[in-house]
Amino acid sequence: MEQTRGETRARRIEQSLIAVKGAGDLATGVIHRLARAGFPVVATELPEPTVVRRTVSFAEAVLLGEMTVEGITAQRASSTQEILELLSQGRVPVVVDPEGRLFRRLHPLALVEATLSKQNTGITIHDAPIVIALGPGYEAGRDVHAVVETNRGHNLGRVYYEGNAEPNTGIPGAIAGYTVERLLKAPVGGKLYGTRQIGDMVQAGDIIAHIHEAGCAGEPCSCQPTPIVAAIPGILRGLLRDGLTVKADMKVGDIDPRAAREHCFTISDKSRAIGGGVLEAILHLMQHL
């Protein structure tokens, strides 16, 4: 009986596996929704994830070994056997696989491009029976089977089976009336070191982090680190991990002016809406396979 159950579980995994490229906070919302709906999910990430909302990102499993977000646990895996074992345990394997070789080995039912790079990263409509992309950069019906809207507003989470998502405006969606003011960006390139923690209440003018320019980090020198300063009051909702190398003008953190600390440790409304769109797209497209 136990062997039969195991065989049934393995067959279900093989037939319904979803591969998600990316495991940042928005991708995590997608992964969480799919896992809760009963799909086995595997995610890929970079060796050094550049994730701002680390407390709600399965990408943290790359460095921590495992990461739990709202009852779903992701764990780093490095082989096909480990992936299958974790899936059989109801966990989400996270694999360092920037080249996407994993997808070709596992033959997933669906592939979700969730890096939100806002440009085509090489995913094609032929990579899986169902291919879905988040946000701009892909055309539904040509590059992928479906595109899910990621821009805050009336269409957030909408599924397009033809055409494109709304173009990238370069301006983040408004939260409590703030847009670009809530973002923390690196004024110069170098290594980032935080002075505050995710979940801290901050005020306008507070120093959130410093950038040590190349050649200065960790070495005695006369260089003065460049501060990153909060423009608005609120809760520090996200901040890159210490020691990461950043480029000038790169997003390194964000402040939530709603000042609700629990928002730092739960999946956002935006992530949930996008996750719902992906689930809808998969279930709809499965009917036409």
Give the positions of each predicted feature:
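Well-ordered secondary-structure scaffolds
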Residues: E2-L289
